[in-house]
Every structure is written in C-alpha cells, then in structure tokens.
Curated annotation (Swiss-Prot):
Heme b b566 binds at residues 97, 196. The keyword Transferase does not apply. Its cofactor is heme b. The cytochrome bc1 complex contains 11 subunits: 3 respiratory subunits (MT-CYB, CYC1 and UQCRFS1), 2 core proteins (UQCRC1 and UQCRC2) and 6 low-molecular weight proteins (UQCRH/QCR6, UQCRB/QCR7, UQCRQ/QCR8, UQCR10/QCR9, UQCR11/QCR10 and a cleavage product of UQCRFS1). This cytochrome bc1 complex then forms a dimer. The gene is MT-CYB. Heme b b562 binds at residues 83, 182. Keywords: Electron transport, Heme, Iron, Membrane, Metal-binding, Mitochondrion, Mitochondrion inner membrane, Respiratory chain, Transmembrane, Transmembrane helix, Transport, Ubiquinone. It is found in: Mitochondrion inner membrane. Pfam families: Cytochrom_B_C (PF00032), Cytochrome_B (PF00033). Belongs to the cytochrome b family. GO terms for molecular function: metal ion binding; ubiquinol-cytochrome-c reductase activity. Binds 2 heme b groups non-covalently. This is Cytochrome b. A ubiquinone binds at residue 201.
Amino acid sequence: MKILRKNHPLLKIINHSFIDLPTPSNISSWWNFGSLLGMCLMIQILTGLFLAMHYTSDTTTAFSSVAHICRDVNYGWLIRYLHANGASMFFICLFIHVGRGIYYGSYALSETWNIGIILFLMTMATAFVGYVLPWGQMSFWGATVITNLLSAIPYIGSTLVEWIWGGFSVDKATLTRFFAFHFILPFIIAAFALVHLLFLHETGSNNPSGLNSDSDKIPFHPYYTTKDLLGIFLLLLVLMILALFFPDVLGDPDNFTPANPLNTPAHIKPEWYFLFAYAILRSIPNKLGGVLALILSILILAAFPLLNNSKQHGLIFRPVTQVIYWIFTANLLVLTWIGGQPVEYPFTMIGQIASITYLAIIIILMPISNTIENNIIKL
C-alpha cells in the first residue's frame, strides 16, 4: 500500500498534499480554517445540487419552488437551511482565515495570498447571486440596488447595468442568469482552491512563531488530519445547531414576502457578511466614490505584502501592531453593525469614522507601527 501511495500517478499527488506533506510541528488551531473552508465548500456544493433539482429559476415560480422544497421534498427544509446557514459558516471561516493570514504574516507568500483574494471575491459574488434566487423582497431589492451601482461607471455604466439585467429592470432574465452563475461559480472556486493549495505547498506553510521551520517538520497525517477532523466535527455541530434550532436567525424577515417591484422595503440591506463593505459604500455621499470605496475595501488586502516593512514575520513578537490589529478587528465589527442600521444620525457619522479608520489602519498606522518596532529592535 505504501509503495502504491508513493508511486501511483494519482495517489502520489494526494500523498504529497495530505499524507506525507512536511508540516511545521507548531501550527495552532488557527490553521484549521483552510480545511474547514474546504468542508464548507463541499457542503454547499452537495446541498446546492439537491436544491437545484427542485428549484425553478422563473420569477413566477421561484418563491413557490423554495416553499415547495421546504414543505414537500423529503428533508428539503433541512437541505435548504443547511445551505443558507452553511453560507454564513463559510464566511465566518473565511474571515477568520484571512484574519489569521494578516496576524501571522501569511501575506508574505504573495502568490497564495493573491489567489486567496480572488477566491474571496468569487465567494462574495456566488453568495450575492445566491441570495437573489429565493425571489423574496430583500432578494429582489438587494439585486436591484447592488447591480445598479454599476451605473456609476462613466460612459458605459447604464448600458452595463441593462446588459447584466437582460432588460430594463431586474426580471426573469436576471434571475435565470444569476442561477446559472450561482451553479457554476462554486466549481470554479473549487478549481482555484486547488491552485491556492498548489502554491501553498510550493513554499510550505507559515507557522505561529514566524521563524523558518524547515528543521522541525512532521508529516501531515496522522497529526493534522486528526486535528482537522476535530475542527470539522465542531463546525458541523455549530452548523446543525444553527440549521435545527435557529434556522432564520441570520436571514432577513422581508425575504418571507414574495418579490414586489411596486413596494420597497424600509431598509434594504444585504446578508450580514456583506454589511462591512455595504457600510463603507453608504458612508460616501458620492455614488462613484462609494463604489470605488466598496471595491477598495476588499482589494486593499492585496496591499498587505506591498506595505509590509517589518523586519519580523507575523505579529507574535510585535505588541504595538498587535494593538492596532485588534482595533482593526473591532472596527470591522462596528462596520458590520452600522451596515445593518438605517441611514440616519448617529449611524451615518459612526459609519464614516469607521470607514476612514478601516483604510487608515491598513495604509498608514500599520506601516508606522512596523517602523517603530524596527527601531525598537535596534535599541
């Protein structure tokens, strides 16, 4: 079996990736979230496949087909709620995974980091088009508002919006193409995830100390397969608690009402995992400026390798930047809260302050704190 594992053309790839892979002996539970994201993706693809068997992407029947899945399909309610809450678990793992990458300096592996940013953007796109499919009030108005942002692009904006809508408003053509995108994107994400792993295994994984771990490696199996299994069981436990006891806690009550183009909800807002970016978008009075800030809020992640001027790897021995990092995390939570609030005083002002702080921490404060710590080392 050992000879086959090491020599077989296909098994050899699996062996080098998940069995005999040399791994740093000191990586903590924060490194579990990569495997948890893989697990989330598998859950989403499987539950999504079963939902697609019963869903109809037509404006007249989409809402009814989701109700039919919940009422008439065997365990349809469970599949639907696993899929909806699975998306939330996916984004929780994603935010922690990115947060760990920032804290421990994983952005130094620039190819892996940049493919990760592409994966993040594709996951956000998939979640957005997926949210439109149940064709409730928030689905319809969320799609209308977010796609309409493209009209801020000079010259081609209006044409581009109508091209994406497939008409002069969000309608049947939009729903059909969004379903097609939502079906195909997870498979593209899976392919990119393999490329992400490929680049990671080229350089080897980072570790909490930020030091070179070539002299102290252990095989991935059985040490980290066991550790990953524990993480997967805990993830499934939280997901099942959400799906079985609090299935609608992360959803929007407006989505229980079928889409009505003649009735606008009081507060249009996306799913909770987009609220931080939505808050940044709303905090700028100018439409084009808001769209640029929205894009920048994600693409700013690509600046981390460029702005890093520290002589140390990761934040483990850098108390000044650690404080700034946790302020950044708290600021992100404030933005998420503000994104779900109405556009009125004092929420608008808090949103503007938090948006400026978000960008200032990454572009100004972190490089300054790095310089301070570099000078402390010289003392």
